[in-house]
Amino acid sequence: MKDNQTLYRYEFKYLVNEKVSEQIKGNVIKFMNVDEFARKMNSNSYFVSSIYFEDDFNTNFTEKIDGNKIRKKFRIRNYSKDLNNDPIFLEVKGRNLDRTFKKRTKIDYEDIITINNRRNINSLLKKYPNNDIINQFIFELYKKNLKPKIIVNYSRTPFANSQGLYFRLTFDKEISSDFLPVIMCGKMVKDSIGIVTIRGSNMNVLKKMSL
């Protein structure tokens, strides 16, 4: 995914136990490939960590639970347990009616400290000139008094369609979360429960592939 490029897609999520997840994975691997990034890992999976921002009223959480069709949220995401050795992204993700969208830009570890301390945040505007995500994030940060509220970690095994339309299937497990400022893996959601997510650019194809 290119920097500052908006990706639109349809998305369906399912809670499944480990047995069902492995059964689906066994069938999927017959006609889909593990994505290029995950193939570099021994287990065909990679670590994902996301820090989510919220206002004082937990509006993002409430809108998600209520199923609002128009919503968005900001998060910091990386794919390694060592922030100093891995790309870090500031992302905005949301929903516009039936489709979800995601847009991201690469940032540095020092920027996370700047955001967390809320000191000299405007320096990011000079560091990343004409960056839509940075501009939007800082505006929302001040307007809604956004703060990093929760961190979510998990292991992801992704499959991608090698030909034709954009189609992606991911299996997430070992899901844990904790409230900030405690930045560490904390409360395990449940060992045997995972999330299967189907994403794609064509609604008709996704309906046929849905569980």
Predicted regions and their residues:
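Phosphate-end processing signature that detects enzymes handling 5′-triphosphorylated RNA
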Residues: 1-211
